[in-house]
């Protein structure tokens, strides 16, 4: 087997108030000089200003840029300001983190992830979801050298974001089943350790589902730890296989066709219900777990017309065709897709 490099975060800080240690953490990681802080329009005030103040208190010169969307145009905009910068910090939600991560990767710089919400597993993964003209592409990037997850800030984010992140973790169930299937049928490289870590995080979320409540710092801490663990599983595997299978293909298809897609994790959760049925597994178990964390389980709860659910199911196999899943090479007919969505009570 060819040698592979596994990139993992060197420092992970979670807990209330850790945003105030941003400057010291960067010093401990041997950074100096200029730092770039990437934020969203809202997250600058929520956490960006605190991170900047902490950096300046440690003697850093700080540049700041605001991004509105996760596009290559946003990535290039950040890149334009990275001359002389020693470290890039992404302070915000998934889009901000992905843009900061991708721009740092392209410039060969280290990146620190500072999430303000626990909405998906990109917090610590070596992947970035960047939108292009044909939808959203999952691009290879460098893992963050550090993660600073202030659970007090994250607990104040809309609960829908945290529930979406938990649903994204629960979707690891079918991602692992798809990966095992590809290993058996196509001899695709499979990592027992990455799969075990990914599945463990999903089981941990489901086991603790009744304790995941709005506004609780403990709930934010649990979700963040699970999302970070899932991201590390991706790093170990060298691909997003441990956390992305047929359910993610379904979500990406919805992103392409639905007039107003739901959150990424929400769509993946609903996709997991249906893909678990295709695998012959306990789809009701998945549905009930999602319901316990107040994540959507139906098209109506996603706010998406049933017609788009059916269409997304029929086209999902064409997303990343090199990634074999339970959908196979030919996918589902319209009749099979409609039947699947009705049997699982998604529509």
UniProtKB/Swiss-Prot annotation:
EC number(s) recorded for this UniProt protein: 1.1.1.261
Regulation of its function: Partially inhibited by divalent metal cations such as Co(2+), Cu(2+) and Ni(2+).
Biological process annotations from GO: glycerophospholipid metabolic process; phospholipid biosynthetic process
Entry binding sites for substrate: 121, 168, 252
Catalytic activity: sn-glycerol 1-phosphate + NAD(+) = dihydroxyacetone phosphate + NADH + H(+); sn-glycerol 1-phosphate + NADP(+) = dihydroxyacetone phosphate + NADPH + H(+)
CDD domains cross-referenced by the UniProt entry: Gro1PDH
GO cellular component term of the entry, any: cytoplasm
Broad class of enzyme this protein falls into: oxidoreductase
Note accompanying the cofactor annotation: Binds 1 zinc ion per subunit.
Keywords: Cytoplasm, Lipid biosynthesis, Lipid metabolism, Metal-binding, NAD, NADP, Oxidoreductase, Phospholipid biosynthesis, Phospholipid metabolism, Zinc
Coiled-coil annotated residue ranges, if any: none
GO MF terms, alphabetically ordered: glycerol-1-phosphate dehydrogenase (NAD+) activity; glycerol-1-phosphate dehydrogenase (NADP+) activity; metal ion binding
InterPro entries per UniProt: G1P_dehydrogenase_arc (IPR023002), G1PDH (IPR032837), Glycerol_DH (IPR016205)
Thermal effects: Optimum temperature is 75 degrees Celsius.
Top-level taxon in the UniProt lineage: Archaea
Function field: Catalyzes the NAD(P)H-dependent reduction of dihydroxyacetonephosphate (DHAP or glycerone phosphate) to glycerol 1-phosphate (G1P). The G1P thus generated is used as the glycerophosphate backbone of phospholipids in the cellular membranes of Archaea. Is also able to catalyze the reverse reaction, i.e. the NAD(P)(+)-dependent oxidation of G1P but not of G3P. Is not active toward glycerol, dihydroxyacetone, glyceraldehyde-3-phosphate, glyceraldehyde and glycerol-2-phosphate.
Other remarks in the entry: G1PDH is a pro-R type dehydrogenase, which selectively transfers the pro-R hydrogen from NADH to dihydroxyacetonephosphate.
Annotated family: Belongs to the glycerol-1-phosphate dehydrogenase family.
Record's subunit section: Homooctamer.
Name of the protein: Glycerol-1-phosphate dehydrogenase [NAD(P)+]
Lineage: Archaea, Methanobacteriati, Methanobacteriota, Methanomada group, Methanobacteria
Name of the gene: egsA
């Amino acid at each position: 087997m060819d040698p592979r490099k596994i990139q993992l975060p060197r420092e992970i800080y979670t807990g209330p108030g850790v945003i105030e240690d941003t400057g010291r953490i960067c010093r401990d990681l041997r950074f100096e000089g200029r730092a770039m802080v990437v934020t969203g329009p809202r997250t600058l005030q929520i956490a960006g200003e605190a991170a900047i103040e902490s950096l300046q208190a440690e003697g850093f010169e700080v540049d700041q840029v605001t991004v509105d969307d996760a596009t290559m145009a946003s990535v290039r905009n950040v890149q334009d300001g990275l001359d002389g910068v020693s470290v890039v910090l992404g302070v915000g939600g998934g889009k901000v983190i992905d843009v900061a991560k991708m721009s740092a990767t392209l410039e060969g710089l280290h990146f620190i992830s500072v999430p303000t919400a626990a909405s998906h597993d990109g917090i610590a993964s070596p992947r970035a979801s960047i939108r292009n003209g044909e939808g959203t592409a999952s691009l290879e990037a460098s893992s963050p050298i550090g993660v600073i997850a202030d659970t007090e800030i994250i607990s104040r984010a809309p609960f829908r974001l945290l529930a979406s992140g938990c649903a994204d973790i629960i979707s690891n169930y079918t991602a692992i089943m798809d990966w095992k299937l590809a290993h058996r049928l196509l001899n695709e490289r499979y990592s027992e350790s990455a799969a075990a870590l990914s599945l463990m995080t999903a089981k941990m979320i489901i086991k603790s589902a009744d304790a995941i409540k709005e506004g609780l710092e403990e709930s934010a801490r649990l979700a963040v730890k699970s999302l970070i663990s899932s991201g590390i599983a991706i790093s170990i595997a060298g691909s997003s296989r441990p956390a992305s299978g047929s359910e993610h293909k379904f979500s990406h298809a919805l992103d392409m066709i639905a007039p107003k897609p739901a959150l990424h994790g929400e769509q993946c959760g609903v996709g997991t219900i249906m893909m678990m049925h295709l695998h012959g597994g306990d789809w009701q178990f998945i549905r009930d777990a999602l319901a316990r964390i107040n994540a959507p389980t139906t098209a109506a709860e996603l706010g998406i017309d049933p017609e788009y659910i059916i269409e997304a199911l029929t086209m999902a196999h064409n997303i990343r065709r090199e990634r074999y899943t339970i959908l196979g090479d030919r996918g589902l007919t319209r009749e099979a897709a409609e039947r699947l969505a009705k049997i699982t009570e998604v529509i």
